[in-house]
Every structure is written in structure tokens, then in C-alpha cells.
Amino acid sequence: MPLLYEKVMAHENDLQAGFLLGNEAIGRGIIEAGCSVAAAYPGTPSSEVMESLVRWKKKLDHPIYLEWSINEKVAFETAYGASLAGARSVAAMKMVGLNVASDSFMSAAYLGVRGGLVVVVADDPGPHSSQTEQDTRFFAWFAKAPVLDPSTPAEAKDMVLRAFELSEKYLVPVLLRPCLRVCHARQNVSLAPPRPVVDAGPFKKNWTRWAAIPRYRLVLHKELNEKLEAMRKDEALARPYLVAGNTDSKLALITSGSVSSHVRDIVRSDGLADGDMAAGRDCICLWQSSMALA
């Protein structure tokens, strides 16, 4: 089935916006960011990320290498190998898939990356199609890796590029954690031309890092802690997004990810949106926090 935007846009070869599923928006963000390699293992709510990448690749004649891997560990290691050679890469899976990939993922957090590495892990609170409701943010805390938590399809697309930039700035893998209600929601999404794919070149050996023995792992752990501390002090990352409300309010609601949409609905239904007052309560200032650090 073709993507919905292909039906509703009049000029398919000159698109500036599309009405996209969250996973389609993530796929588009991956293409626009100049990603070289993407590997995935299917599982709701993440499957459409790779499916959309296949269509974007064909439509835009993009050189990205795509792979349905035999499992999530192989998908992650395929993407990580490309990153070690200097290429931008993505691994995509659902949250229980990160259990399978966890051995490699935990080690990669210590070793770091060369090219930007984004791990798209779709969570399924509910659950709708999963055996657990596990929260990937706890895995990020466990591995000491940053995680971006989008609240809408458009934000998910924008966060793909942000995740690549964060990964390359601090040389760490970055998790993107869209929930089912982001993955399978639709929204008008701005589109941009893809960035050029940079040739990664040959892999550069460094056994004290890429094949580090425990002695050097201690050094890498110290470096990882220093990276996290630097990220905490990074004003561009620490600044939350103001979504709605009045900055003079006495009450602030701090939300993260897909729950932000539910909170906005509740605020509006109670007549508190846009600084209004109802039932004698103070107006509400609604913020959204989109990044978590270990």
C-alpha cells in the first residue's frame, strides 16, 4: 500500500509537506539526515519505519543500505559496524527487541561511536501487541545513554536529525523512543531534501577502544560519565519546549513523550488551555521535556 501522502499531495516530486504516520515520519527523517545504513527487525509498533524507508529509498533514489535483519541483535550490530566506520546509521526495533540487542547495546555505550548512531526503539504501553509494557527509558538509564522522547509524528521526524547530531557531538549511541500513539498517529509533517550521504571510508583500528579489555573499559566508563555530565550542562539540550500556557502561572505540568498529547486534551477539556481559568483554579503552564539522561 502506498504512503498516504502519495495520494493526497498534488506534486509528488516537489513535496514540502505530507500527512504521515509517525513511523513514516521517522523514516523520512532518517533519509533527510543523510543516513547510510539502516537495519531493523519487525515488530509492532516499529515495523513501518523500515517499510517506509524502502519506499523513500525507491522514490528518492537514495543510496541508503537497508536490511531486515534476522534479529534485533544483528540489526544493532549491523548499524553499529557502519557507525564504527564513520557512517550515519540506524537500528530499529520494538522495546522487547532491545532485550535481544542489549549485550551489544550496553557495550556500545562504553565504546562510543564514530558516525552518528540512532537506535529507534518503539514502546508499547497498554500493551497493544507486546508481552510486556517495559519502558525503554530505563534501558537508557541502565546503559548510560541519552534518549529522545517525541510527543508527535512531526517531532519524531525532527528528533531524528537532532539524535544524529547529539550522537556525533558526544560520540555516543542515542535512543529515539516513540510510543505506539506516536508511531501510529498521523500528522502534517514538513519535508526537506535529503542531506548528502558521506562516504564513511575504511574502518580505523584502535584496539584500546573498539576491542577494549577490562583495563581500558574503566577508562571508557570514566569518559562516558564525563560525556553525560557535559550533556547535562548543554543548554541546547536542557532547555524544555514550551508547548502552551502562561509563564506567569503558579502551576506547571512537565510532561514527556506521547503523554503530552493526553495532558493537552485534559487541559483543554477543563477550560485551562491558553492561560484560561476555570473553577477558581490558576491557569496552567504546560511544558514538554523531551530528553532524559542517565
Q: At which residue positions do the language-model features occur?
A:
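Flexible, low-complexity linker and terminal segments
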Residues: 2-23, 150-294
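Thiamine diphosphate
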Residues: 2-153, 158, 179-181, 245-250, ...
